[in-house]
Amino acid sequence: MEMAKANGWAVVCTSTNTNTVPIYSKYTRCTELRRVDDNDIYKLATILDVNGCWRKLMSIIPKRLDAQACSAPGALNYQEIAAKVGLKYTAQQISLIDGTAERLTPGQSISQVMIDEWKTSGKLNERPTVGVLLQLLVHAEIYSAADFVALHFLNEPKPERPTDGPAAHISLDLCSEDLSEDMDVEDGASYQPNTSALNAAVEQARGTGMNLDYFDKHMVRRDKSVPQQLENGTSSTVPVPPPRAARSSRLLKATASNVAPTTASNAPSASNTANVPNLSILNASSKKLAASSEQTLQPQNIPNLSILNGSSEAVLMATTSTTLDAGKSDNASNGRSSASTSTATIPNVPLITLLIENSSCEISDASDATQITSKSTATKTVPDMSTASYNNLPAISALNLNIASGAGELDGNGAKARGDNADNNSSGTNSLSNDDDEQKEDDDDDDDDDVVDVDDEEADVSLPNLSNSDHNDSSLTTVTCTSGENSFEFTNDSSSASNDDYTNNIPNLSELQQ
């Protein structure tokens, strides 16, 4: 009675004395659902959410029901009432409740929404009670929710279930007697396998490889360098990679390819410099240079002009002398007398006597390099082989005379000495002989003629331009040549500003073959 007053009940159930609620129960069967705590409604709603049980409960609620009269146990005759008054909720209304699930907050349940709607509907006597809820759950065979209401709301025993069917009770407890009967095993039973049978089964399973939890993996090592036997019986050959060149050889090839263009580009300059006489060994006063020049190889930088004359036979090499005068100039080059000694090889002095047409020249060695003669003599004897050769170069060192008797004289018609400013070391003569067959007899008869006729154009070309030498201090060289009664001067500018290359120092070979 006090519990009913506390929950707001206006009328107390007075049907019979047996329906009295125990004093310690939380709710009575006549307690309206709107008076039940929200926490208890929430727990009940979580059970009804399983498998959509709330739809089954909502579909069997009667339309008009005297809740207070039907709250007692067994007082609700559902079949008669449902046929008389009908159902309260239709399928469309159930779908509306189902549509609210999308708008629910995380703490709400759709079954709770259904209970909230049901407990607040109807008149005073038509509002649902805990007793009506328990009887409808049993009629809908939702026994899990019915057990929760009987135990937690009313403190009553669980409602009875049918003995058969899905709603029948399923016991999960095992009786000790039943368990002992199931666990009894005879010692001499034939179905118990022995050790030999177990080992045989293991061996059989190992052979078939069936139902193995683990297995041993044995790796077979193979030497890949040895050809393996194939299935068809033939042996496969091991592929051998091609030999690879060593790193050092590849570097050498790369270096050679890089050096080759440089060598080719430097070749023209080397050919030009090799054709210039090495004037550093022309100083006869240095004995060291003379000795070293004898040991070096003879550079064949001057063409062998003696073989260019097809009409001449074996030409003997010698040195001829022709009077030359150094031009008057402060920078005039030192005059030198060419008296080169010949060895077995062809001398390096161009055979200018071959330049005259139809000439068959024979060059004789001058016996004395310091003697200035007005008559060129030709001998047919081979020069002394023991004479020292300065690298097959013109014996220009003989022009630097250190003796006092080496004063230069010029003989000829109208030839006059112009070396007044030259000392003994800078004075000298360069004798050139260019006699043809027709002039030999005239030269023998005329002893007064000291100078041999030389063609002007050929002499200019054939004379070596020694002013291009690195050791020649003179940048301007003037040479005076005498031909018969005429004399002419040849000036060669070898200054650093000149554009002449070394090729101007080589005789014009196109004019040699006449």
From Swiss-Prot:
Its BP terms in the Gene Ontology are: signal transduction
Major location (coarse): cytoplasm
Composition bias type Low complexity, residue spans: 259-274
Question: One GO term of the cellular component aspect?
Answer: cytoplasm
**Where do the record's region annotations for Disordered lie?**
226-250, 255-274, 324-343, 366-385, 413-514
Q: Which SUPFAM superfamilies match?
A: DEATH domain
Compartments, as annotated in UniProt: Cytoplasm
What does the UniProt keyword field contain?
Answer: Cytoplasm, Developmental protein, Repeat, Transducer
Q: Where is the composition biased (Acidic residues)?
A: 434-460
Tissue expression as described in the entry: Maternal and zygotic gene product.
Which InterPro entries does the annotation name? Answer: DEATH-like_dom_sf (IPR011029), Death_dom (IPR000488), Tube_Death (IPR029397)
Question: Which residue intervals are annotated with compositional bias (Polar residues) in the record?
Answer: 422-433, 477-514
Q: What does this protein do?
A: Required for the determination of embryonic dorsoventral polarity. Is involved in transduction of information regulating nuclear import of dorsal protein.
This protein is called what?
A: Protein Tube
Q: Which organism is it from?
A: Drosophila virilis
